Amino acid sequence: MKVKFLSLFLFLISLTACSPNNQNDKAVHFGIAQKPQNLDPRFASDAASEKMNNLIYSSLFYFDNNFKMQSDIVSYQIISSTEYVFELKEDLPYFHNGSRLNIKDIIATLENVISDPMSPLAVEFKNIDKLVKISHERFSIFLKEADINFIQKLNIAILPSALINNNHNFSMNPVGSGMFRYIPTSNKIRLERIKDGQVIEFIEIKDPTVRALKLLKREIDIVQNDLPIEVVNFLENQSSISISSTIGSNISYIGFNFNDSLLKDVRLRQAIAMAINREELVQYFLDENTRLAEQLFAPEHWVSANLVHTSFNPEQSRNLIKSISPLSPISLTYKTSTDPFRLKIATIIQNQLAQVGIDLTIKTLDWGTYFQDIQNGNFQMYGLTWVGIKNPDIYYKIFHSKSIPPKGLNRGYFKSLKIDNLLKSSLTSNDWSAVILEIQNQVGFLPLWYEGNIAAHTKQISNYKVHNDGNWDGLKNIRKHNDY
Protein backbone atom coordinates (compact mmCIF):
# COMPACT_ATOMS: atom_id res chain seq x y z
CA MET A 1 0.00 0.00 0.00
CA LYS A 2 2.80 2.41 0.89
CA VAL A 3 4.63 1.63 -2.38
CA LYS A 4 1.45 2.35 -4.36
CA PHE A 5 0.96 5.59 -2.46
CA LEU A 6 4.53 6.73 -3.14
CA SER A 7 4.19 5.93 -6.84
CA LEU A 8 0.92 7.83 -7.06
CA PHE A 9 2.38 10.77 -5.17
CA LEU A 10 5.40 11.03 -7.46
CA PHE A 11 3.13 10.73 -10.49
CA LEU A 12 0.96 13.61 -9.27
CA ILE A 13 4.06 15.72 -8.68
CA SER A 14 5.19 15.11 -12.25
CA LEU A 15 1.82 16.30 -13.55
CA THR A 16 2.25 19.63 -11.79
CA ALA A 17 5.94 20.17 -12.47
CA CYS A 18 5.22 23.44 -14.20
CA SER A 19 2.52 24.67 -11.82
CA PRO A 20 2.82 28.22 -10.47
CA ASN A 21 3.76 28.57 -6.83
CA ASN A 22 3.50 31.19 -4.10
CA GLN A 23 7.14 31.43 -3.07
CA ASN A 24 7.27 35.14 -3.99
CA ASP A 25 3.85 35.88 -2.52
CA LYS A 26 4.07 37.65 0.84
CA ALA A 27 0.82 36.08 2.10
CA VAL A 28 0.99 32.84 4.09
CA HIS A 29 -1.19 30.24 2.37
CA PHE A 30 -2.64 27.82 4.94
CA GLY A 31 -4.17 24.61 3.57
CA ILE A 32 -7.10 23.40 5.68
CA ALA A 33 -9.34 20.33 5.45
CA GLN A 34 -12.63 22.14 6.12
CA LYS A 35 -13.47 25.80 5.84
CA PRO A 36 -15.18 27.55 8.77
CA GLN A 37 -18.97 27.33 8.80
CA ASN A 38 -19.74 30.40 10.93
CA LEU A 39 -17.51 33.34 11.90
CA ASP A 40 -20.04 34.67 14.42
CA PRO A 41 -18.66 33.31 17.72
CA ARG A 42 -22.13 33.33 19.28
CA PHE A 43 -23.24 30.58 16.92
CA ALA A 44 -20.07 28.78 15.80
CA SER A 45 -19.93 25.10 16.70
CA ASP A 46 -17.49 23.53 14.24
CA ALA A 47 -13.77 23.25 14.96
CA ALA A 48 -12.53 25.37 12.04
CA SER A 49 -14.82 28.26 12.98
CA GLU A 50 -13.73 28.19 16.62
CA LYS A 51 -10.05 28.18 15.64
CA MET A 52 -10.46 31.12 13.27
CA ASN A 53 -12.70 33.08 15.64
CA ASN A 54 -9.98 32.74 18.25
CA LEU A 55 -7.75 34.79 15.94
CA ILE A 56 -10.33 37.45 15.04
CA TYR A 57 -11.89 38.13 18.44
CA SER A 58 -10.67 38.86 21.98
CA SER A 59 -12.20 36.68 24.69
CA LEU A 60 -13.23 37.97 28.09
CA PHE A 61 -11.29 35.06 29.62
CA TYR A 62 -9.13 32.34 28.09
CA PHE A 63 -7.44 29.12 29.21
CA ASP A 64 -3.67 29.10 29.65
CA ASN A 65 -1.47 26.05 29.02
CA ASN A 66 -2.24 24.75 32.52
CA PHE A 67 -6.02 24.93 31.95
CA LYS A 68 -6.26 27.97 34.26
CA MET A 69 -8.35 31.03 33.43
CA GLN A 70 -6.61 34.27 32.42
CA SER A 71 -7.88 37.61 31.13
CA ASP A 72 -6.25 40.54 29.36
CA ILE A 73 -9.49 42.51 29.64
CA VAL A 74 -10.69 42.33 33.27
CA SER A 75 -9.67 41.46 36.80
CA TYR A 76 -12.30 40.13 39.19
CA GLN A 77 -13.27 39.56 42.81
CA ILE A 78 -15.57 36.90 44.20
CA ILE A 79 -17.83 38.78 46.61
CA SER A 80 -19.90 35.70 47.43
CA SER A 81 -20.75 32.36 45.84
CA THR A 82 -23.30 34.16 43.66
CA GLU A 83 -21.73 37.60 43.13
CA TYR A 84 -18.69 38.52 41.04
CA VAL A 85 -17.29 42.02 40.48
CA PHE A 86 -15.20 42.74 37.38
CA GLU A 87 -12.94 45.72 36.68
CA LEU A 88 -11.54 46.70 33.29
CA LYS A 89 -7.79 46.59 32.83
CA GLU A 90 -5.80 49.32 31.09
CA ASP A 91 -4.75 49.31 27.42
CA LEU A 92 -7.82 47.49 26.15
CA PRO A 93 -7.74 46.48 22.47
CA TYR A 94 -9.45 48.30 19.63
CA PHE A 95 -12.09 46.66 17.49
CA HIS A 96 -11.23 46.43 13.84
CA ASN A 97 -13.82 49.13 13.04
CA GLY A 98 -11.81 51.63 15.12
CA SER A 99 -13.79 51.72 18.37
CA ARG A 100 -12.12 50.72 21.63
CA LEU A 101 -13.45 47.79 23.63
CA ASN A 102 -15.31 49.03 26.70
CA ILE A 103 -17.74 47.92 29.38
CA LYS A 104 -20.76 48.46 27.11
CA ASP A 105 -19.41 45.88 24.67
CA ILE A 106 -18.91 43.28 27.40
CA ILE A 107 -22.37 43.72 28.88
CA ALA A 108 -24.05 43.88 25.45
CA THR A 109 -22.33 40.67 24.35
CA LEU A 110 -23.33 38.78 27.49
CA GLU A 111 -26.92 40.07 27.44
CA ASN A 112 -27.27 39.24 23.76
CA VAL A 113 -26.12 35.65 24.23
CA ILE A 114 -28.28 35.18 27.34
CA SER A 115 -31.39 36.34 25.48
CA ASP A 116 -30.81 34.34 22.28
CA PRO A 117 -31.99 30.71 22.61
CA MET A 118 -30.47 29.93 19.20
CA SER A 119 -26.93 30.48 20.47
CA PRO A 120 -25.20 27.32 21.72
CA LEU A 121 -23.59 29.58 24.34
CA ALA A 122 -26.94 30.48 25.90
CA VAL A 123 -26.91 27.36 28.06
CA GLU A 124 -23.62 28.52 29.59
CA PHE A 125 -25.26 31.61 31.02
CA LYS A 126 -28.72 30.41 32.02
CA ASN A 127 -27.58 30.67 35.65
CA ILE A 128 -26.96 34.43 35.39
CA ASP A 129 -29.59 36.36 37.33
CA LYS A 130 -28.53 39.87 36.34
CA LEU A 131 -25.67 42.07 35.15
CA VAL A 132 -25.18 45.42 36.84
CA LYS A 133 -22.99 48.25 35.54
CA ILE A 134 -21.33 49.88 38.58
CA SER A 135 -19.25 52.46 36.71
CA HIS A 136 -17.46 52.93 33.39
CA GLU A 137 -14.80 50.50 34.61
CA ARG A 138 -16.69 48.07 36.88
CA PHE A 139 -19.66 45.72 36.62
CA SER A 140 -21.18 42.87 38.61
CA ILE A 141 -22.63 39.52 37.66
CA PHE A 142 -25.16 37.92 40.01
CA LEU A 143 -25.92 34.21 39.73
CA LYS A 144 -29.15 32.42 40.56
CA GLU A 145 -27.16 29.77 42.40
CA ALA A 146 -23.50 29.04 43.13
CA ASP A 147 -21.34 27.72 40.28
CA ILE A 148 -17.77 26.78 41.15
CA ASN A 149 -16.73 26.82 37.47
CA PHE A 150 -18.52 30.02 36.47
CA ILE A 151 -15.38 31.92 35.45
CA GLN A 152 -14.47 29.13 33.04
CA LYS A 153 -17.73 29.81 31.21
CA LEU A 154 -16.65 33.38 30.48
CA ASN A 155 -14.40 32.19 27.67
CA ILE A 156 -16.53 34.22 25.30
CA ALA A 157 -15.59 36.52 22.41
CA ILE A 158 -16.55 40.17 22.93
CA LEU A 159 -18.41 41.96 20.11
CA PRO A 160 -18.88 45.71 19.53
CA SER A 161 -22.15 46.80 21.15
CA ALA A 162 -23.01 49.22 18.33
CA LEU A 163 -22.87 46.42 15.77
CA ILE A 164 -24.88 44.08 18.00
CA ASN A 165 -27.59 46.74 18.27
CA ASN A 166 -27.58 47.16 14.47
CA ASN A 167 -27.95 43.39 13.92
CA HIS A 168 -24.63 43.28 12.09
CA ASN A 169 -23.94 40.03 10.23
CA PHE A 170 -20.79 38.87 12.03
CA SER A 171 -20.84 35.54 10.21
CA MET A 172 -20.33 37.20 6.81
CA ASN A 173 -18.21 40.14 8.01
CA PRO A 174 -16.70 39.46 11.44
CA VAL A 175 -15.50 42.47 13.45
CA GLY A 176 -13.47 41.64 16.53
CA SER A 177 -10.56 43.02 18.52
CA GLY A 178 -8.19 40.07 18.18
CA MET A 179 -4.75 39.91 16.60
CA PHE A 180 -6.21 39.46 13.11
CA ARG A 181 -8.81 41.39 11.19
CA TYR A 182 -11.00 39.82 8.53
CA ILE A 183 -10.41 40.95 4.94
CA PRO A 184 -13.70 40.83 2.99
CA THR A 185 -13.27 39.07 -0.36
CA SER A 186 -15.68 37.42 -2.76
CA ASN A 187 -14.32 33.89 -2.71
CA LYS A 188 -11.34 33.71 -0.31
CA ILE A 189 -10.85 33.62 3.44
CA ARG A 190 -8.12 36.09 4.32
CA LEU A 191 -7.00 37.55 7.65
CA GLU A 192 -4.52 40.37 8.24
CA ARG A 193 -2.32 40.42 11.34
CA ILE A 194 -2.79 43.78 13.06
CA LYS A 195 0.76 44.28 14.32
CA ASP A 196 2.55 43.98 10.98
CA GLY A 197 0.04 43.50 8.17
CA GLN A 198 0.97 39.86 7.52
CA VAL A 199 -1.83 38.26 5.51
CA ILE A 200 -2.96 34.67 6.05
CA GLU A 201 -5.04 33.06 3.31
CA PHE A 202 -6.97 29.93 4.27
CA ILE A 203 -7.47 27.51 1.40
CA GLU A 204 -9.87 24.59 1.75
CA ILE A 205 -8.33 21.42 0.26
CA LYS A 206 -10.38 18.45 1.38
CA ASP A 207 -8.16 15.68 0.06
CA PRO A 208 -5.05 15.24 2.28
CA THR A 209 -2.91 13.91 -0.56
CA VAL A 210 -3.70 16.94 -2.70
CA ARG A 211 -3.01 19.16 0.30
CA ALA A 212 0.45 17.62 0.72
CA LEU A 213 1.09 17.83 -3.02
CA LYS A 214 0.30 21.54 -3.07
CA LEU A 215 2.65 22.01 -0.13
CA LEU A 216 5.48 20.33 -2.02
CA LYS A 217 4.81 22.54 -5.05
CA ARG A 218 4.72 25.65 -2.82
CA GLU A 219 1.17 26.41 -3.88
CA ILE A 220 0.50 26.54 -0.15
CA ASP A 221 2.97 27.22 2.66
CA ILE A 222 1.71 25.19 5.60
CA VAL A 223 -0.73 22.44 6.61
CA GLN A 224 -1.72 21.22 10.05
CA ASN A 225 -3.30 17.88 11.00
CA ASP A 226 -5.82 15.77 9.05
CA LEU A 227 -3.00 13.91 7.28
CA PRO A 228 -2.68 10.10 6.96
CA ILE A 229 0.48 8.63 8.43
CA GLU A 230 1.84 7.65 5.00
CA VAL A 231 1.58 11.27 3.88
CA VAL A 232 3.31 12.45 7.06
CA ASN A 233 6.10 9.90 6.60
CA PHE A 234 6.58 10.99 3.00
CA LEU A 235 6.76 14.68 3.93
CA GLU A 236 9.25 13.96 6.71
CA ASN A 237 11.67 12.66 4.08
CA GLN A 238 11.46 15.77 1.90
CA SER A 239 14.36 18.19 2.37
CA SER A 240 12.16 21.13 1.35
CA ILE A 241 9.67 20.51 4.17
CA SER A 242 9.94 21.11 7.92
CA ILE A 243 7.84 19.12 10.39
CA SER A 244 6.82 20.01 13.95
CA SER A 245 4.59 17.97 16.21
CA THR A 246 3.21 17.59 19.72
CA ILE A 247 0.85 15.40 21.71
CA GLY A 248 -2.83 16.19 21.33
CA SER A 249 -5.67 16.86 23.74
CA ASN A 250 -8.57 16.66 21.27
CA ILE A 251 -10.46 13.39 21.60
CA SER A 252 -11.65 11.36 18.63
CA TYR A 253 -14.62 9.20 19.51
CA ILE A 254 -17.62 7.22 18.29
CA GLY A 255 -21.05 8.54 19.23
CA PHE A 256 -24.22 6.47 19.61
CA ASN A 257 -27.93 7.21 19.24
CA PHE A 258 -29.51 6.01 22.48
CA ASN A 259 -33.02 6.21 21.01
CA ASP A 260 -32.05 3.44 18.61
CA SER A 261 -33.70 0.11 19.43
CA LEU A 262 -30.38 -1.74 19.18
CA LEU A 263 -27.85 0.74 20.52
CA LYS A 264 -29.83 1.50 23.67
CA ASP A 265 -28.69 -1.96 24.85
CA VAL A 266 -25.45 -1.45 26.81
CA ARG A 267 -24.31 -4.96 25.82
CA LEU A 268 -24.09 -3.91 22.17
CA ARG A 269 -22.12 -0.79 23.02
CA GLN A 270 -19.76 -2.88 25.15
CA ALA A 271 -19.37 -5.37 22.31
CA ILE A 272 -18.49 -2.60 19.87
CA ALA A 273 -15.92 -1.18 22.30
CA MET A 274 -14.21 -4.57 22.70
CA ALA A 275 -14.30 -5.35 18.96
CA ILE A 276 -12.29 -2.31 17.86
CA ASN A 277 -8.52 -2.77 17.99
CA ARG A 278 -7.56 0.80 18.83
CA GLU A 279 -3.92 -0.10 19.49
CA GLU A 280 -3.56 -1.41 15.93
CA LEU A 281 -5.23 1.65 14.45
CA VAL A 282 -2.94 4.00 16.36
CA GLN A 283 0.19 2.00 15.55
CA TYR A 284 -0.35 1.77 11.81
CA PHE A 285 -2.49 4.74 10.83
CA LEU A 286 -1.82 7.59 13.28
CA ASP A 287 1.30 9.51 14.22
CA GLU A 288 3.55 8.65 17.15
CA ASN A 289 2.12 11.42 19.36
CA THR A 290 -1.36 9.88 19.36
CA ARG A 291 -2.50 8.38 22.68
CA LEU A 292 -5.34 6.00 23.49
CA ALA A 293 -8.29 7.62 25.27
CA GLU A 294 -10.71 6.39 27.92
CA GLN A 295 -12.42 9.72 28.72
CA LEU A 296 -13.01 13.20 27.35
CA PHE A 297 -10.01 14.91 28.95
CA ALA A 298 -6.37 14.01 28.35
CA PRO A 299 -4.25 12.79 31.31
CA GLU A 300 -2.58 16.18 31.84
CA HIS A 301 -5.92 17.89 32.56
CA TRP A 302 -6.72 18.21 36.27
CA VAL A 303 -10.17 16.62 35.88
CA SER A 304 -8.83 13.42 34.30
CA ALA A 305 -9.74 10.28 36.28
CA ASN A 306 -7.93 6.96 36.70
CA LEU A 307 -9.86 4.43 34.62
CA VAL A 308 -9.37 0.81 33.64
CA HIS A 309 -8.23 0.45 30.04
CA THR A 310 -10.86 -0.91 27.64
CA SER A 311 -9.10 -3.90 26.09
CA PHE A 312 -9.48 -5.40 22.63
CA ASN A 313 -11.39 -8.65 23.25
CA PRO A 314 -13.12 -9.97 20.10
CA GLU A 315 -14.09 -13.28 21.71
CA GLN A 316 -16.03 -11.64 24.51
CA SER A 317 -17.49 -9.24 21.97
CA ARG A 318 -18.81 -12.16 19.88
CA ASN A 319 -20.40 -13.71 22.96
CA LEU A 320 -22.21 -10.48 23.72
CA ILE A 321 -23.42 -10.20 20.13
CA LYS A 322 -24.75 -13.77 20.24
CA SER A 323 -26.61 -13.03 23.46
CA ILE A 324 -28.31 -10.08 21.75
CA SER A 325 -28.95 -11.64 18.33
CA PRO A 326 -28.21 -15.40 18.35
CA LEU A 327 -29.46 -16.15 14.83
CA SER A 328 -28.36 -13.29 12.60
CA PRO A 329 -25.77 -10.50 12.38
CA ILE A 330 -26.60 -7.07 13.75
CA SER A 331 -26.84 -4.34 11.12
CA LEU A 332 -25.82 -0.76 11.94
CA THR A 333 -25.02 2.41 9.99
CA TYR A 334 -21.95 4.57 10.67
CA LYS A 335 -21.80 8.13 9.37
CA THR A 336 -18.58 9.95 8.58
CA SER A 337 -17.34 12.79 6.41
CA THR A 338 -15.92 12.38 2.92
CA ASP A 339 -12.39 13.01 4.22
CA PRO A 340 -10.32 10.08 2.83
CA PHE A 341 -8.47 9.49 6.10
CA ARG A 342 -11.68 9.38 8.19
CA LEU A 343 -13.19 7.06 5.61
CA LYS A 344 -10.17 4.77 5.87
CA ILE A 345 -10.54 4.59 9.67
CA ALA A 346 -14.26 3.87 9.26
CA THR A 347 -13.51 1.06 6.79
CA ILE A 348 -11.06 -0.59 9.19
CA ILE A 349 -13.61 -0.35 12.01
CA GLN A 350 -16.18 -1.86 9.64
CA ASN A 351 -13.88 -4.85 9.03
CA GLN A 352 -13.16 -5.31 12.73
CA LEU A 353 -16.85 -5.26 13.65
CA ALA A 354 -17.61 -7.78 10.90
CA GLN A 355 -15.35 -10.26 12.71
CA VAL A 356 -17.71 -10.28 15.72
CA GLY A 357 -21.03 -10.37 13.87
CA ILE A 358 -21.85 -6.72 13.22
CA ASP A 359 -22.68 -5.70 9.67
CA LEU A 360 -21.67 -2.03 9.54
CA THR A 361 -22.76 0.15 6.63
CA ILE A 362 -20.67 3.30 6.12
CA LYS A 363 -22.45 6.41 4.90
CA THR A 364 -20.22 9.31 3.82
CA LEU A 365 -21.52 12.86 3.61
CA ASP A 366 -20.07 16.26 2.75
CA TRP A 367 -19.00 18.09 5.90
CA GLY A 368 -21.94 20.50 6.09
CA THR A 369 -24.60 17.80 5.70
CA TYR A 370 -22.73 15.41 7.98
CA PHE A 371 -22.38 17.90 10.83
CA GLN A 372 -26.02 18.94 10.45
CA ASP A 373 -27.09 15.30 10.78
CA ILE A 374 -25.03 14.95 13.96
CA GLN A 375 -26.54 18.10 15.44
CA ASN A 376 -30.05 16.87 14.60
CA GLY A 377 -29.52 13.37 16.02
CA ASN A 378 -29.94 11.83 12.57
CA PHE A 379 -27.58 8.84 12.97
CA GLN A 380 -27.05 5.45 14.58
CA MET A 381 -23.28 5.79 14.99
CA TYR A 382 -20.83 8.46 13.92
CA GLY A 383 -17.17 9.40 14.29
CA LEU A 384 -16.08 12.87 15.32
CA THR A 385 -13.52 14.81 17.37
CA TRP A 386 -14.18 17.12 20.31
CA VAL A 387 -11.86 20.10 19.83
CA GLY A 388 -10.62 22.52 22.47
CA ILE A 389 -12.71 21.32 25.42
CA LYS A 390 -11.30 22.47 28.76
CA ASN A 391 -14.19 23.02 31.20
CA PRO A 392 -15.45 19.84 32.97
CA ASP A 393 -18.99 21.24 32.72
CA ILE A 394 -18.89 19.78 29.21
CA TYR A 395 -19.94 16.49 30.85
CA TYR A 396 -23.24 18.12 31.85
CA LYS A 397 -23.79 19.51 28.36
CA ILE A 398 -23.12 16.17 26.68
CA PHE A 399 -24.62 13.62 29.07
CA HIS A 400 -27.40 15.22 31.14
CA SER A 401 -30.89 14.19 30.02
CA LYS A 402 -31.96 17.86 29.89
CA SER A 403 -29.09 18.80 27.56
CA ILE A 404 -30.80 17.66 24.36
CA PRO A 405 -30.16 20.23 21.58
CA PRO A 406 -30.72 23.15 21.41
CA LYS A 407 -30.35 23.24 25.21
CA GLY A 408 -27.07 21.36 25.16
CA LEU A 409 -24.85 18.93 23.26
CA ASN A 410 -26.54 15.62 24.10
CA ARG A 411 -26.94 14.77 20.42
CA GLY A 412 -27.34 11.04 21.07
CA TYR A 413 -30.27 11.47 23.49
CA PHE A 414 -28.37 9.78 26.31
CA LYS A 415 -30.54 9.42 29.44
CA SER A 416 -29.47 8.05 32.82
CA LEU A 417 -31.02 9.08 36.13
CA LYS A 418 -27.89 7.88 37.92
CA ILE A 419 -25.62 10.07 35.80
CA ASP A 420 -28.04 13.01 36.11
CA ASN A 421 -27.71 12.80 39.90
CA LEU A 422 -23.93 12.41 39.74
CA LEU A 423 -23.68 15.42 37.45
CA LYS A 424 -25.70 17.52 39.87
CA SER A 425 -23.33 16.57 42.68
CA SER A 426 -20.22 17.24 40.55
CA LEU A 427 -21.40 20.74 39.64
CA THR A 428 -21.22 21.56 43.36
CA SER A 429 -18.16 19.57 44.44
CA ASN A 430 -16.12 19.89 41.21
CA ASP A 431 -15.18 16.22 41.68
CA TRP A 432 -16.04 14.52 38.40
CA SER A 433 -14.48 11.10 38.96
CA ALA A 434 -17.77 9.30 39.70
CA VAL A 435 -19.38 10.81 36.60
CA ILE A 436 -16.46 9.81 34.41
CA LEU A 437 -16.43 6.23 35.75
CA GLU A 438 -20.18 5.76 35.29
CA ILE A 439 -20.05 7.11 31.73
CA GLN A 440 -17.37 4.52 30.98
CA ASN A 441 -19.46 1.76 32.61
CA GLN A 442 -22.51 2.68 30.53
CA VAL A 443 -20.43 3.30 27.37
CA GLY A 444 -22.03 6.72 27.03
CA PHE A 445 -19.66 7.22 24.12
CA LEU A 446 -16.66 5.31 22.79
CA PRO A 447 -13.36 7.18 23.29
CA LEU A 448 -10.78 6.28 20.66
CA TRP A 449 -7.65 8.43 21.01
CA TYR A 450 -6.17 11.86 21.57
CA GLU A 451 -4.81 12.47 18.10
CA GLY A 452 -1.32 13.94 17.94
CA ASN A 453 -0.79 17.28 16.22
CA ILE A 454 1.53 17.79 13.30
CA ALA A 455 2.34 20.78 11.10
CA ALA A 456 4.28 20.62 7.85
CA HIS A 457 5.55 23.74 6.13
CA THR A 458 8.03 24.95 3.55
CA LYS A 459 11.44 26.31 4.55
CA GLN A 460 10.10 29.81 3.90
CA ILE A 461 8.05 29.52 7.10
CA SER A 462 9.38 30.04 10.63
CA ASN A 463 8.11 30.84 14.14
CA TYR A 464 5.09 28.53 13.91
CA LYS A 465 4.25 26.67 17.12
CA VAL A 466 1.91 23.68 17.26
CA HIS A 467 -0.42 23.62 20.27
CA ASN A 468 -1.84 20.56 22.07
CA ASP A 469 -5.45 21.43 21.31
CA GLY A 470 -4.72 21.88 17.61
CA ASN A 471 -5.61 25.58 17.51
CA TRP A 472 -4.19 27.99 14.94
CA ASP A 473 -2.62 30.38 17.45
CA GLY A 474 0.78 29.67 15.90
CA LEU A 475 -0.29 32.08 13.15
CA LYS A 476 0.04 34.94 15.64
CA ASN A 477 3.84 34.75 15.30
CA ILE A 478 4.39 32.96 11.99
CA ARG A 479 6.87 34.49 9.54
CA LYS A 480 7.37 33.97 5.81
CA HIS A 481 10.78 34.57 4.24
CA ASN A 482 10.49 35.15 0.51
CA ASP A 483 14.26 35.24 0.07
CA TYR A 484 14.67 31.55 0.97
Where are the predicted features?
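N-terminal lobe/hinge region of extracytoplasmic solute-binding protein
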Residues: 32-81, 111, 175
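Aromatic- and charge-enriched surface segment that lines or borders ligand/interaction sites
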Residues: 52, 75-118, 214, 262
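Surface-exposed binding/hinge segments that line
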Residues: 87, 121-164
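Gly/Pro-rich hinge or "lid" segments in bacterial periplasmic/extracellular proteins
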Residues: 146-201, 207-210, 315, 319, ...
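Detector for C-terminal structural segments
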Residues: 186, 275-303, 340-350, 374-484
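Ligand-site clamp/hinge motif
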Residues: 187-233, 359
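Local pocket/hinge segments that shape ligand/substrate recognition
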Residues: 199-202, 224-314, 337, 407-417, ...
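Ligand/substrate-recognition segments at binding pockets and active sites
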Residues: 322-388
